[in-house]
Structures are given as structure tokens and as C-alpha cells.
Amino acid sequence: MRAVVQRVKRSKVEVDGKIIGEIGKGLNVLLGISVEDKKEDISYMKDKILNLRIFEDEEGKLNKSLLDVQGELLIISQFTLYGDCRKGRRPSFIKALGGEKARSVYNEFIDQCKDSVHNVQTGEFGADMLVSIENDGPVTIMVDSEKIF
């Protein structure tokens, strides 16, 4: 699994002109799922993201996690995070998991996050979405279950 995690003041996602998910202070997570992902990757990514110390403490240092600040979470599926641009000019997405298998992994990730976070909002899996993000900082972190970065 691969995620782009952005600290936000607010974020929302729309489908067909309707807001389907919206949060205030928290994290916007763009989540990509690989054909190689396993069940333990879901727990690893959830724990890593929810406990990333990317919120400021009283001294202005990045010492607090989403859980510490009781922030909100917006999770959006993003298969293009597995786009491979090494050959040619058109990305290849053969490493991205698709269809119902990907939807199942995405939903399991959401369910695990809901066990810890009071407000979890989501995009619509497989839909064409308009995502509005008001970055805070900006603070943007990439997380990968294969630990390649």
C-alpha cells in the first residue's frame, strides 16, 4: 500500500457536484493499493498514518499525531499512486490492484481507521472525484508498506 498523507485545515471530496466527504483539522490520505499487498499491510499503514507525529505541540515542534490532536481523517482511493513512468510517457498501472479486491482492501482500511478516529470521511471508490485540500504547513508525507521511502 502507498499513501500520500497531507496535514490539512480542511478538505472535501465531491462526486457529481455533491460533497460526499468533508473534514476540518486532520489528515487527507490518498491511498493506493498494490497487487502485492497483504492483510498485514492494512494494519501497518493504519498504525503508521494515525501515529505520524506531524502536528505541532505547544512549542511548535512536530510531536503530535492525529490521535493526539483528535483530528479528522479523509481517505480517498488513488490507484494512480502505483503509476510506473519509467518507460515511455504513459504511466503503467499494472501494479495497482483493481476491482472488487481493491474495494475490499480499501474498505478494510477505512474500518480499521474508524476504530481509532472519531470522524472518518471517504471518497467514493472508483468514482471521478473533485478533491479540495487546504494544506496546513504544508506538511505532506509519503508512506509505503514496502518501506521504500
Curated annotation (Swiss-Prot):
Keyword RNA-binding: yes
Enzyme class: hydrolase
BP terms from Gene Ontology: D-amino acid catabolic process
Protein keywords: Cytoplasm, Hydrolase, RNA-binding, tRNA-binding
EC number: 3.1.1.96
An example molecular function term from Gene Ontology annotations: D-tyrosyl-tRNA(Tyr) deacylase activity
Domain notes from UniProt: A Gly-cisPro motif from one monomer fits into the active site of the other monomer to allow specific chiral rejection of L-amino acids.
Subunit-level organization: Homodimer.
Protein name: D-aminoacyl-tRNA deacylase
